[in-house]
């Protein structure tokens, strides 16, 4: 499973949204209805799943689904 597919799966599980709504340009708050607690739980789930650390500063930059995918791919490539 690719990083993108796994990120999408985590988002569907954490936010309870339909997989069809989770596209690369979807914004977590505006499009997927996430609140600050949801965002924290998403970041924690991604850290656990991918074995990466996402700082608070980095987490604030992750606004869209593609932001999360790109960040994790970059971290895993280091």
From Swiss-Prot:
Post-translational modification: 4'-phosphopantetheine is transferred from CoA to a specific serine of apo-ACP by AcpS. This modification is essential for activity because fatty acids are bound in thioester linkage to the sulfhydryl of the prosthetic group.
A single MF term (Gene Ontology): acyl binding
Keyword Transport tagged: no
Residue ranges annotated for the Carrier domain, each copy included: 1-76
Keyword set, alphabetical order: Cytoplasm, Fatty acid biosynthesis, Fatty acid metabolism, Lipid biosynthesis, Lipid metabolism, Phosphopantetheine, Phosphoprotein
Pathway(s) annotated for this protein in UniProt: Lipid metabolism; fatty acid biosynthesis
Subcellular location: Cytoplasm
Gene Ontology BP annotations: lipid A biosynthetic process
Single GO cellular component term: membrane
Location, primary (coarse class): cytoplasm
Residue(s) carrying O-(pantetheine 4'-phosphoryl)serine: 36
Functional summary from the UniProt entry: Carrier of the growing fatty acid chain in fatty acid biosynthesis.
Family designation: Belongs to the acyl carrier protein (ACP) family.
PANTHER family referenced in this protein's UniProt entry, alphabetically: ACYL CARRIER PROTEIN, CARRIER DOMAIN-CONTAINING PROTEIN
HAMAP family tied to this protein: Acyl_carrier (MF_01217)
NCBIfam families: acyl_carrier, PRK00982.1-2, PRK00982.1-4, PRK00982.1-5
Protein name (Swiss-Prot/TrEMBL): Acyl carrier protein
Organism annotation: Solidesulfovibrio magneticus (strain ATCC 700980 / DSM 13731 / RS-1) (Desulfovibrio magneticus)
Native organism taxonomy: Bacteria, Pseudomonadati, Thermodesulfobacteriota, Desulfovibrionia, Desulfovibrionales
